[in-house]
Every structure is written in structure tokens, then in C-alpha cells.
Amino acid sequence: MSDVDVGVAVHSRDSSAAWHRWRYALPTVVGALIIVLAIHASTVESIVAIWWRSETFAHGFLIVPIVLALIWHRRRRLGVLTPHPDWLGVLLLVGAGAFWLAGYAGEVLVVRQLALVASIWGVVIAILGREVAQAMLFPLGFLVLAVPMGEVLIPPLMEWTADFTVVALQFSGIPVFREGLFFSIPSGEWSIVEGCSGVRYLIASFTVGVLFANLSYRRLWKRLLFVAASVIVPIIANGFRAYLIVMIAHLSDNRLAHGIDHFIYGWFFFGLVMLLLFWVGSFWRDAEDKSSPVGDGPVPDAPATPRVGFAAYAAAAIATVAAWPLYAQHLERQSIASAQTPLTLAAPAGARGWVLDSDPLTDWRPHYDPPSAGLFQTYRKGDKVVAVYLAYYRSQQRGAQLVSSWNVMIVQKHPVWNNVGQERVEGALGSGTLDVRETRLRSPQQRLLIWDWYRISGHDILSPYVAKLTLAADKLSNRGDAGSAIMLVAPYDDPTHPPTAVLREFATDMMPSIDGALARVDAALIASGQ
């Protein structure tokens, strides 16, 4: 018999053995995953919808095909393993389900999406076992990058880009006047908006960098080093990109870098930087591991799990996954029932010299989801004027939430208003008192100083993450999900002297009255049995 015949015979025998090991496990795990995706169809739909509408996350369409290709690339290694169901996967599904329910209760979409990925891991481990999951560790982990996340990085990246650009311009000898994310140079005015943050470049670079590192390097330190470079390089490059665009416009008397060429220069520069990064990274590529996944000798067959064993674990996994959405439906029915009673929020009574004023302080309004009840009321005390915005939410759902990424002081590229700065103020009313978020807005006619925070279950909360956790805990414990946004607004003229003292005085004088107005809404809900 020739060497070719021997090779064919060995390959045929290996394929037959692999099929014997996987003949029940493979269709079972595929079927279970399809059912899990069907159970979480709304979560799957939310992921795909974001891929479709956002260029930042459009690469998500490629993640699943890449994951399948990576698993296929490991088929020989997987073929010599014998799948064995594992209760660890079911335990992981319990944790993933609880995580999903918390995301549902808090209306945090990214938590539900991450929980779905964790559920996929749990199903794979429950049906195929830890050894098989270990062999698919990178493809399963890479699936996390299909989840559209990273927008939380936009504000700090915008701040970094503004800092870098201003310093670079000053280093170039150009005088700069900066106010928040806006800055002026002799040739014109500029602002750093979300599109300038570089988050799109960062996410794209990180995704490709992780894949490149796994395929190119065998040593862990090389992989980690390249992934770190794929994060650091685009952040620094984005600072240079913004600086170069401003310089091109400045040196061309604003003839260039203001229209579509603004984006062309940016993408060309980013593409060049990424090309250089991966070109340099290729010099340290490790040789591909040519060793056989089966070793030098024959691999003994481990006892195969019978069909009923795979079916039992698949049923347990599916039941565990389905339990959490069923409980969520129960909570949803309660929420719908409680939303039937209309709410009224009366203006807080004036106190300590502050009186209600019918003259509007400003035409500005926060860009918030429609509340269950709300008001915008102006108060005066001598020559001091402050407006109060209260928004009361209950039975919250998408499009009607207290805490949402859509809830902002102004939308990006607002035709009239600009956000020129935002910061945390600790102990706004004195040591040990509440913390507030301070925002400065400007328009051609007016400047506003705004303090805002959340009121949930009688507690003043500043962090949106803590607010989400509190709302989720209240909802899961059948205490409802009511909460309020509180904003105090004062006008001013001099950007160097914002009316901080006026807001502090107003809050000290009027908070008992504001608390009473919100407490009356809470009492009305309790009286109605909700």
C-alpha cells in the first residue's frame, strides 16, 4: 500500500471517529443555540438594528462569520475531542439569565446583549463540555465584540481630543481661547463633537487588533502588547487628526477641511496609521504551529455520551434560558397595569422669599424622554431668577426612561445651543450634602448654568449607573420603578462668574418644597394601589 493510500485511510478513519464522537452533540448544540436566539429574539433584533443604523458598529455584521470561520479553522483539534455535557454550563446560564433580567429591569440594552453572549457560552459548555469550550475559547470570546458598546468612551475621548488639539495649536504658535469643547483661533471657531471623539477609529482598531494578534502571535505577551498598541495608537492618532484638520483649514484661509474633505482627510489619515501599525506588527509574527492536534500516537476514544444525555442537558439549558424572559413578561404586565393612572405634578410652592414667576426664563428645554409628569417653572427673589425642571417617570420603558443615553441637555450640533462644559460638583450645598452635575450652556442670546441629579426611592443620586441599578433593584423587588430628574437653571452673562451662589441659595431655600411636590406624586401612586 502506498503512502497516499495510507494517508487517505488514516484521514477516513479520523473523520469516522470524529463523526462518532460528534454525531449527537453537534446537532443538539446547534438546535439549542437556535432556540436560545429565538427566545431572545428581541435582544438579537436590537443588536442587528444598531449594526444597521450606526456606522460605528457596522463591523458587527462581520463578527459572526469570523467566529464561524475561526471555529472551522479549529475543526481538526475539535474533531479529536469527545463532547461531554457539563453542569457548569447550566450554572453559567443561571448567572447569565440573572444578568439579562437585571438589564431588562434597568432598561440597559447592552447588559441584555452581553447576557445573550454569555448564554451562548453557557449552552456550549452545558452540551459540549469544558474541554471543547476551551478549544473554542478565542472564537467564543471574540463574539463579545459583536455587542455594540463603547459609547461610554465618547465624553472622555472628546475631552482628550480637545486637550490635545489646543495644546498642539499653542505649541505651533497659534493663540487659542478655549471654553469647554469649543475653542477659537484667529481664523475661526471650532468645536469637538461626538464625531471627533475617535471612538469609531478606536473600536475598529481594537476589533481588528484582537483578531490580528490571535492569528499572528503564539506568545501571550506579544498578543497583549499588540492589542494595547491597537488601543493607544488610534487615540493618539485621532488627536493628531483633529490638529491637522484645524491646521489645514487655518493655513488655507478656511478653504479646505470644512466640507466633505474634512472627513476624507480624517479617514485617509486613520487608514494610513492603521496600515503602518499592522505592517510593523507583521515583523514579529510567530511561525504557525504545524504540530498535529492529535499528537504522535493514536488518540483513544473516550466513552461517548448517549443521545439522551445530550438531550437532557439541552432541555435543562433551554429551560434555564427561557425562565428569565417569562418572569420579565410578568413584570411587564404589572408595569402596564400601573401605567393606567394619570399623574399630575404641581409646581413647588415658593419659600423663603422665592416666588413663582410666569415670565419664562429661557426657551431652552432638556432633550429628555417624555415623562409621566413634568414641569418647568421660574422663580424670582429680588433680582435673582432660577428655573426648576422636574420630570417624574414611572412604568419606564424604551422611549420613556429617566436614565437613557438619549437624555441630554442638548442634542449634538444643536442649531442654537452649545454645551461648553460639564463637571461634577461635590457637596453642592456644603460639606456632606448632595453632589450635582454642573453644565454650562450658551446660545447667541443667553448663558445658562444648570445643576441636575436624580431622585429615586427618596435618595439623591448623581451617577447614571447607580441610578440604573437602583431602578432595577426596585423593579425586581416589586417596589415599582418611579424616579425623577431634578434640574436647577440660572442665567448669567459673564463666563468667568457663573451664578453658583444663586443656585446654592435657591437649593437651600427651596429643596423642602421640591421634595414635597415629588412626595405628593409618590403618595398619589401609593393611594391608587400602584
Regions found by a protein language model. Name each.
Residues S2-Q530:
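Hydrophobic N-terminal alpha-helices or hydrophobic patches in metabolic proteins across all domains
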